[in-house]
Amino acid sequence: MSSSVDPSAEDYRREMCTYNQFMEPIYRQALAHLPFQGSVGGLDAGCGPGGLLPSLCHLIGDEGEIMALDASLAHLEAAQQLCEHKELTSRVTLKQADLRTTLPFADDRFDWVWVADVLHPGYFPTPDDPVSEFVRVTRPGGHVVIFFEKMYESKLFPGQPHLDTLYRRYLDYHGRKLTFDNQPNNLHIWLKRSGCEAVQIHAFTMIHASPLTSEVRYYLQDIVVGWFAKTPMDKVTAAGISEDEWNALLQAVAPESPDCVFDHPDYYCMWIALMAIGRKPT
Ligand SMILES: C[S@@+](CC[C@H](N)C(=O)[O-])C[C@H]1O[C@@H](n2cnc3c(N)ncnc32)[C@H](O)[C@@H]1O
């Protein structure tokens, strides 16, 4: 397994906490499908700053414990603070590990493995490798669950076809290097190829509508728009978008603009996530 990126060097805990708040309506739906209730021990692989640990602890019940792994020490530090704040330190063990290597656990150790928004193709060009490791450390009859937000299929400008088409073109260009094997829409296939049975795939949607809460507004404005607004013009034109079209798109989301879409009383965005659940054969 290899990647040019060293995830331990990255610290985006503030963005992750806002992202977790933004995604809350989808997490509620996703968690309701998890077969984790009453389990003794699970693994949160790529736990980040730990935003989902309180919900996972609540879901499994008072007896359950969670091992939470991440490569980033900064994220683990934030997760530690969160666990202290939520009085979960006796139930959660945090550990630094690289998911691109063999996991430091015996075969069949956990009842379940949960991995949310981690197996991005840029970090994991061959997701079958970590997924096989997740299956190895899960007990027979236990479950491996892969969750992915699908920003590329989500809608930032529903009802505004011109902006939506431009944004879609930008996202399509951005995702052009994905292959069948590492495309996150195929997360259920990763589980099947790694030997799981009874694989199910679920889709979840949510809408954030005007008036947006300050967290949602911050996520859309500073993180989503902040991400694409930084794109150099040569990459924008390579995506088939002219400079004028791009400026119109940026103007529509500029916070100081009187026409900023996020301030419109009828604005809404629609987000999508996918989740696949597989069972390790007994
Ligand atoms: C987008 S965050 C998701 C965090 C968390 N699962 C959540 O949903 O809130 C991705 C996390 O994966 C971690 N990560 C990325 N590559 C990794 C690797 N090779 N080994 C361990 N963790 C990794 C990052 O440090 C980051 O915390």
Model-based region annotation:
Residues 2-24:
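Class I SAM-dependent methyltransferase Rossmann-like catalytic core
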Residues 111-126:
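A short SAM/SAH-binding and catalytic strip from SAM-dependent methyltransferases
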Residues 43-45, 49-101:
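Class I SAM-dependent methyltransferase SAM/SAH-binding core
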Residues 145-218, 222:
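Conserved catalytic/acceptor-binding region of the Class I
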Residues 21-40, 55:
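Conserved alpha-helix/loop element of class I SAM-dependent methyltransferases that forms part
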Residues 4-5, 12, 202-265:
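C-terminal helical/coil "lid" or tail adjacent to the Rossmann-like core of SAM-dependent
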Residues 103-113:
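A short acidic, Gly/Pro-enriched loop at the edge of an enzyme's catalytic core
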Residues 128-140:
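A short glycine-rich, Lys/Arg-flanked "PGG" loop and its adjoining helix->strand segment in the class I
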